[in-house]
Structures are given as C-alpha cells and as structure tokens.
C-alpha cells in the first residue's frame, strides 16, 4: 500500500510544501503521556483499524493512539511554516520538538497549526500527535461508526485518516 503523495488541495497549491504521509511510529496506550516505547509503524493517512495502515487494531474508549515521526521543514527561508491535518478522528494534541503547538476536536474537519516558532531551523524536527476517540461514548458526531459493527453500521475509524503536510507561506498569506 502506498500513502497518498499528491498535494491535498490542488486549488491552493504552493510550491514549498512537504507531504508527511508515509510510515510513522505508533503506540496505543492507556495514558496521554508520550510512550517510552513504540508498538511499530503505521502508514499515515490510514486509520489503525484499516488493513492499509499495517496495524489492524481497534482503538477502544479510554485508550490513546500516539503517532511520532521526524521531519525537515519545507525548503526555503522566511515566512511561516504551517502544519496541516486533513482530518484526525476525534480529539488530538500536537507537539513539535516537545512543545505543545495546538490540538483539535472533531473527526471530519481539517485544521492548521503555525509551528514556525518551534522548529529547529532546517534540521531534524520531532512531531508527536496524541489522539483519543471515544467512539460509542460521548456526544460527538460519529455517523455509522460503532465498536460493534453489523447491519448498516461499520467499524470505528480513529486517528489520522487524511493527509498531513507542511507548507512554507509568506508572512502575509491566505
């Protein structure tokens, strides 16, 4: 299986971007704390419940799904570096080089974080995403996802399930 490598927003394509889809480290734990050890690799942007992810595990309520990878910022200098997530199901916190840069709630909406201040220049940078998906518990929109699929209901899908990418943009941008 190959990750989605194309630019995710063709109508707004910028030259200075870096697609972060591909293998990431992952762990499923009972804690929001960064794990000491990783369970293996997951292919982003596929949910861990999906065979294409290489994991094939269902995230249970109360569990945390952690993602980690290293990256270099997009080529160029100046401006701002934005980290885009096409979608993460359901709630997440994002750290760059050990600094919390933001988070998001809602499994179907894209979000963007400005990570410029947390970057280590042009070198190696660490990205950690902690996700929790309370499928079957809580009031979040979930469509037909369930932990007990059958009939018209299908298995829950959690975590990063849309493209993740970086862009270098001018200081003033749309």
List each model region and its residues:
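Accessory beta-strand-rich segments of carbohydrate-active enzymes
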Residues: 3-11, 16, 25-30, 57, ...
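Predominantly extracellular/luminal regions of secreted and cell-surface proteins
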Residues: 20-45
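Short amphipathic alpha-helical segments, especially helix-boundary/capping motifs
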Residues: 43-47, 137-140
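N-terminal glycine-rich cofactor-binding segment
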Residues: 49-56
């Amino acid at each position: 299986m190959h990750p989605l490598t194309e630019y995710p927003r063709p109508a707004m394509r910028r030259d200075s971007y870096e697609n972060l889809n591909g293998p990431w480290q992952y762990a499923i734990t009972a804690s929001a704390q960064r794990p000491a050890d990783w369970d293996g690799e997951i292919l982003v942007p596929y949910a861990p419940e999906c065979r294409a992810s290489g994991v094939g595990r269902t995230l249970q309520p109360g569990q945390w799904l952690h993602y980690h990878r290293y990256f270099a910022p997009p080529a160029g200098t100046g401006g701002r570096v934005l980290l885009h997530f096409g979608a993460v199901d359901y709630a997440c916190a994002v750290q760059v080089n050990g600094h919390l840069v933001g988070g998001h709630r809602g499994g179907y909406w894209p979000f963007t974080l400005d990570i410029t201040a947390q970057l280590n220049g042009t070198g190696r940078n660490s990205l950690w995403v902690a996700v929790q998906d309370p499928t079957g518990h809580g009031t979040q929109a979930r469509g037909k996802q369930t932990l007990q699929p059958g009939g018209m209901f299908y298995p829950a899908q959690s975590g990063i399930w849309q493209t993740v990418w970086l862009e270098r943009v001018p200081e003033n941008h749309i």
